[in-house]
Amino acid sequence: CLALKLGSLCSAQNFCKSSTLVFLMSFFSSISFTKIYYFCAMRFLTADYLFPLYIAPIKEGVLQISDDGQVVAIFKNRIEVPQDKLEIFEGILCPGFVNAHCHLELSHLKGNAEKGKGFLEFSKIIRQRDNYTDTDKLQAIEKAEQEMIANGIVAVGDICNTGDTLVQKQKEHLKYYNFIETFGVYVNKVDIVYNQAIELRNEFRSAGQKASIVAHAPYSVPPVLMRKINNAFDDNDELLTIHIQETKEENQLFENKKGNFFDWLRGINATSSIWLNRNKSTYVLQELGGKKVLLVHNTFAKKEDITDNYYCTCPRANLYIENALPDYSIFDTDKLCVGTDSLASNDSLSILDELLIIQSNSNFDLNTLLKIACKNGAKALGFEKLGTFEKGKIPGVNLIKSLADTKITKLI
């Protein structure tokens, strides 16, 4: 077994800030984290392998980083760099991770939901989100963000139903694309839901944050609201996102007009246009006018459902709620991203933990897994300076080191 320890050498926001990350190579028995502190200076970093993620991995490659964390150059051989300038590490170097799907504002619900009970039972816990003080929520948000930083994450696609996370995000520890989520199964309340979303989106944008209005899921947003979301897309928007095919019941609702979701929606007198106007979950892509969409979960997607959009898998959340995983062979690995989902449906906010599950249930090699964790999420979310070691980018630098123990140590 191979245990890996990772220390972050350069953060994406500030070269003098540090973050940590653990990653995998083949099989794992234990993991640990290392935080690296250093003085700002031009650095020449090398390890057993360098994973630039826009070209093939380079054995004993050298990464030159400026004092603001910007990639200056890549050298394919250590002899190209004066030996006294080299910082040599065991393991591999890769960019910082991108968490393509999270619900940071639900962090205070960690541990409340029983595992494996399905989405409808899980949703009852989410409805308890307001039974907490603002202090409880804000402390949980700050702690969860610190966890992401400690786990080597440099950017996040975050679902927002409230402005609870805005204060923390304004500290700019991480990059965020904020998806202002709408949920409304009653046609007579569509305008209220939509106007609230516009107000919240504008609040985030006024604070300098990327923000777009999005739909929660095909079963929770009727066509009339979906069209409003499509029409709200403006020059500041880059991407939409939606939870899709997360459960068997969702497919049964649209394809067979039966099942637990069907009974639930009828039981709450939801507008019937949700299921009558759609024969498949993926029909909503037409309602969104062909916009660029990040489709999240896809646990029960089939090969014929896959389009040219980006896809995000959250395997630990899928196991937590539905005890099921997607068929990873159906995805284009250039369009596949990974997310943690929320602490309400996960035990950690760790891309490593997600990748361990993907690795065990796919034939993806290490370079592909790293692309899924770094490059693809950055491309999907429009963070052009992240994701690879291309010249001029500021992606963060993560060291992945093989160790025989799990002790936390400071390298510098």
Identify the meaning behind each predicted range:
Residues 208-328, 334-337, 342-343:
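Active-site core of metal-dependent hydrolases
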Residues 108-139, 177-183, 247-289, 359:
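Active-site gating loops and adjacent loop-to-helix segments of metal-dependent hydrolytic enzymes
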Residues 32-80, 379:
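N-terminal metal-binding scaffold of metallo-dependent hydrolase/deaminase domains
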Residues 64, 92-93, 110-173, 195-206:
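Alpha-helical scaffold segments that flank or form the walls of functional sites
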Residues 48, 63, 90, 101, ...:
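Divalent metal-coordination and catalytic microenvironments
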Residues 263, 287, 326-402:
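His/Asp/Glu-enriched, well-ordered alpha-helical/loop segment
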Residues 1, 5-20, 26-34:
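Low-acidity, Ser/Thr- and Arg-rich intrinsically disordered low-complexity segments
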